[in-house]
Amino acid sequence: AWRDCARRALGSRDFGDLSTDRYGSDDPLLIDYICSNTLPRRGIHARPDEVLVTLGAQNALYIAVELLCRADRPAVTEEPGYPDIAETLRRSQSPVTFLPVDGLGLNPETLPDDTRLVMITPSHHIPTGSTMPLGRRQTLLNRAAAQDFVIVEDDYDFEMSYLGPSAPALKSLDTEGRVLYIGSFSKSLFPGLRIGYLVAPAPLIAKARELRTMLLRHPPGHLQRITAYFLAL
């Protein structure tokens, strides 16, 4: 099926899209699928200008950290946690606090008062596999509003829920635009695909697109189109 989608994407009908330098946009078919199918499954509703396609979740994490971290913006993440989040934060300008997690994930009540950024994996914590319950999620959002900080949610491995339905994304509870959401097709398709996405308010996505352009121009248009066709099967 993937081979058939690749052949289709190479056809004359798609040639105009594939021969276009999309540094200022992403494949419209892929963006439409993400907005109309992928995100609603997680309880998230976003416009096309609120989504950026990235080279996997790691690229999205790096872009988020580059845009949000400064010396005067202390960051918090989980301990233990996803090693790439920890390493990306260590390389940033922000002072970083690693908060121990319990069986329910990160406890929002333990956040330092000067927190300005929280990076977490609430739906499937790495490496414990725990899921942050609804009460803690709401407490975290309330703390974010009270302390005026931003949350980056890496929705790692949310599909791998064997004991019941996947918990709604933290972003689905966000009414103030404080949660940046990162997703990837690595688990649902295959790890080598390296197609992810970042969901955030449109002004921040515009800045993220500028940064992405300086880093790698854009993810290959042909790969984006094949992915869109494959997902729509």
Give short role names for the model-derived ranges:
Residues 180-233:
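PLP-dependent aminotransferase class I/II
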Residues 6, 11-147, 159-160, 165-176, ...:
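Conserved core of the PLP fold type I
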